[in-house]
Amino acid sequence: EIIAYFNVAANKVKIEKPGVKKIEEISFHVKGDGAIANIANKVQDALKKNGTLNPDPITVKKGASHNAAFPVENQSWSSRLSAGAVSSASCVEKNGAYMITIRMKDEHISYEQARKPLQTKHGQVVDILKANEIDEQMKSLSWLVTLHDLDQTYSGTTIVCTIDAKSQTMRSAHYRIISNATIKASAPIVGDATVNA
């Protein structure tokens, strides 16, 4: 019942287009050593410098399309979350609003599954790292490193939102998404290596 209520409220954001401000904070931590881990750390430093890891807030005006700014990115809907993907859900009423907290079950997403993110449980409600995004980022490093595989495990994903009890309009939403990735790559100089990020 809580999940169904959340889905309706989340989907109303893209239908009613109330205006939204998206603030994103992205970080990753590289575990491992050697040349490949060193390259991964250099990529992270470059992403920090060009603003990819801490992009400027995005403000979408009332009435404008929210499809690109609000999860799920570039879809006309926001959530198709199923109860089977959830480990717990709670709802507390306070001051005319419902505060909903959803904790998702852990999910392993292979590099091949990341090619079809909407077929994953996380991809039904949050933006996950997609294979085409990884491929695009790796193009600039193709002279240095070849990516063979990238497995992601999403663990601890939490959604906390406040929904107006009368209008069922979402007032705020906070998505916390944690992905642990294992990257298998090779570099001409050092050979094969595995890095956890």
Spans of features found by a protein language model:
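Subset-of-secretome marker
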Residues: 1-197
